[in-house]
């Protein structure tokens, strides 16, 4: 326990917050190249095949990034834009790939929350796009 005089001289040391996306180096997004595109299974109560890519960023760090939305066109050597944001049920996945930029296509047939998935606005009067696999 410090004395009042010690606190006057030195003060309390405040801890700096730890970054939740350290590989981005305080940038909002980073460009990278897909090293491996694969599927993985989520943690315990959930069950699915989640699409994930191992990405080498321009600062030469490698991260696991989640590919959001239904269906994607990514493969090895695709250039992608990576943003922060973890996936709660995938351990070690702390980043998201931005859809609709660089080599990543937007989600086809998406009508709601389109900006999050890089989907263009459908033409007025046009029938909704057919669903993919059932």
Curated annotation (Swiss-Prot):
Keyword hit for Secreted: no
SUPFAM superfamilies: Nucleic acid-binding proteins
Function of the molecule: With S4 and S5 plays an important role in translational accuracy. Interacts with and stabilizes bases of the 16S rRNA that are involved in tRNA selection in the A site and with the mRNA backbone. Located at the interface of the 30S and 50S subunits, it traverses the body of the 30S subunit contacting proteins on the other side and probably holding the rRNA structure together. The combined cluster of proteins S8, S12 and S17 appears to hold together the shoulder and platform of the 30S subunit.
Record-stated family: Belongs to the universal ribosomal protein uS12 family.
Gene: rpsL
Biased composition (Basic residues): 111-123
Biased composition (Low complexity): 124-134
Disordered: region residues: 1-27, 103-134
Annotated protein name in UniProt: Small ribosomal subunit protein uS12
Assembly behavior: Part of the 30S ribosomal subunit. Contacts proteins S8 and S17. May interact with IF1 in the 30S initiation complex.
InterPro entries in the record: NA-bd_OB-fold (IPR012340), Ribosomal_uS12 (IPR006032), Ribosomal_uS12_bac (IPR005679)
Keywords per UniProt: Methylation, Ribonucleoprotein, Ribosomal protein, RNA-binding, rRNA-binding, tRNA-binding
Keyword tRNA-binding found: yes
GO biological process: translation
Modified residues (3-methylthioaspartic acid): 89
Alphabetical list of Pfam families matching this protein: Ribosom_S12_S23
Organism, scientific name: Porphyromonas gingivalis (strain ATCC 33277 / DSM 20709 / CIP 103683 / JCM 12257 / NCTC 11834 / 2561)
NCBIfam families reported for this sequence: rpsL_bact
GO molecular function, one term: tRNA binding
PANTHER family: 30S RIBOSOMAL PROTEIN S12 FAMILY MEMBER (PTHR11652)
Biased composition (Basic and acidic residues): 10-20
GO (cellular component) term, any one: small ribosomal subunit
Gene3D superfamilies xrefs: Nucleic acid-binding proteins (2.40.50.140)
